Amino acid sequence: MTHGQMQKGMMGSEDMKKSMMTGMDAMNKIAMSGDTDKDFAMMMKVHHQQAVDMSEMELAHGKSPAMKTMAKQIIAAQKKEIAKFDRWLAKQK
């Protein structure tokens, strides 16, 4: 592995860790409503967005074709679920 490849891999890993921490911060800042269903949807939406963000980092920095394929599948599935949460939350206002 060249130094450049190692740096690229580290950048991807560090970006992923920062994304996880940002997502955790976002989840911690969500004010709980006391409505379990609404709180579940809000928290899961952030959680799913983290999965999308991490998958995009895998596509940008990863090397494994298998992991890149999985990342693409995760992005598609999680975006659909985020849209479902958005639709449900929109009806709760």
Predicted regions, residues:
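His/Met- and acidic-residue-enriched segments that coordinate or traffic transition-metal cofactors
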Residues: 1-93
